[in-house]
Amino acid sequence: VSVGNSLTSGFRDGALYLDGQNESFPSMLAKQMGLAGGTQTFTQPLMPNNVGGFTNITGFGGKYTLQLVDVKDASGSVVGKKLAPVQSTAAATLDIIGGTGKYFNNMGVPGAKSYHLVASGYGSAVNLSLGKANPYFVRFATSATTSVLADAMAQKPSFYTLWIGNNDVLSYATSGGLGVDQKGNLDPSTYGSNDITDPNVVASVIKNVILGLKSANANSKGAIANIPYVTSIPYFTAVPYNPVPLSSASASTLNTSFSAINAKLKSVGMAERFSTLTASTSNPVLIIDKSLTDISAYLPAQYAIYGQARHATANDLILLPASSVIGIDPTTGLPPTSTSTKINGVTIPLADQLVLTEKEAAKVIAATDAYNASISSLATANGLALVDANAKMKELGTTSGIQYNGVKYTASFVTGGAFSLDGVHPNGRGYALIANTFIDAINKTYGSTLPWVDINAYSGVTFP
């Protein structure tokens, strides 16, 4: 049995769909265990199509596909084509495939945070409208009152994988830090959807899951993975902090405005917030940083929008959705004309939800480190294989990447070969890499000889 979230389910390209599920890392592990004499069957709550999403639930669209889209100039005329991810329309309504006695070996629930695994009613259709249930678990839960852990325990697994805790920091990060760091608050029922879970809550839940699975089968063995840093994935690394091209004249005009604000800041004993821009293609984007003191009341009216603005630094993470916003005139949705005064990321600060600032990223890293310390301790205390997913994702994020049978894999968006089009989840080959990381840990801990999966045999990004 495999317990976890989207990374366990095979979610990729922004959706859960059939082909992705068939290339989930647990299904790959099951096949390799089958080669070694283990069970030949591994059941998954398969989606009814290869698009994903739910037509009757807002916010659950279909998968992203790579398509050639129009490139327009400032007048709206099409001047070329470019490759870009485009989200599909959801293909079907929510289908119920669970029920009494209907168990699935893959218990990965996209969107689940640690404490959701032990929440009764997380698979209740009635609770969906209350925000207390998850449609993916509603699909395959054995009852409206069960929990993910209860359904996993009922299967009395002889071997299990557990990978949970990613979403406890990820939703905060992908929202650009719009949530709250709940460190010190042990009551998840009071959390917002984008909050960082208190590390003690995560540790307690994971301990209870392990003890629950052990109580279901005293002879069970297992592998538990730690949490990768968000700085390892393309959603946070694909867009540079300094992608703004400026002419000499534009740089000079902007410098005049920003230097005046810097002078005002300096006069009241505050640090400067704006860089000196140059005639180049690598100027920093203008962002909102809500940790800054708001000085809008002390600025001339035309500068009031810069009250909590500054230029980004190399330590800020610009989120992937910003790539379609930076350099665009917000009044037209098109590239700026020679007379445009409003340009996203240049004269108009990027919205807070499009940037994970250095301070916000530090909160994510600190929470991740705390989660991982607990995961490591719990693995040791319970004799489980510890899968260092964090180290593997760091390795993937290096320039040299990871080599496999003549193919180089990196964390670069689209071109790196390991991540799907949502920039967060791996593609088939990325999940195969994860499967091999699990296999290495399992073999090391239990003395088994499970063979690696062939990474190159699985699917990558599909080009049109």
Predicted regions located by residue number:
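Conserved active-site regions of diverse hydrolases
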Residues: V1-P464
